């Protein structure tokens, strides 16, 4: 995948405010669907749909803990996204 394709994919995933907020909430800690739903004030079904997109983009990891699945941000992927986005946004000159 070229840098341009990576940039487009990243910005497409981040084009929804709820997903941006989910990434912020999942940095440095893990939360289950119900905790995310309560915090974001959306339904668990909506959270699950957003998490599917974030998992497909390889930005979150699911960890089963007992009956619950907890999600967290993949720090190394977030660092890569930061690098790719910065390469687009940096000023030349």
Can you say where each PLM-predicted feature lies in the sequence?
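Intrinsic structural disorder/low-complexity segments
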Residues: 10, 52-53, 73, 86
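Short alpha-helical linear motifs
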Residues: 48-50, 89
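Alpha-helical residues within the helix-turn-helix
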Residues: 38, 49, 55-56
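N-terminal helix-turn-helix DNA-binding core of bacterial DNA-binding proteins
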Residues: 5-45, 65-77
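N-terminal leader segment of winged-helix/HTH proteins
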Residues: 1-17, 59, 80-85, 92-93
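Residue cluster at the C-terminal edge of the helix-turn-helix DNA-binding motif
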Residues: 55-63
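Residue-level detector of intrinsically disordered, flexible termini
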Residues: 43-45, 56, 84
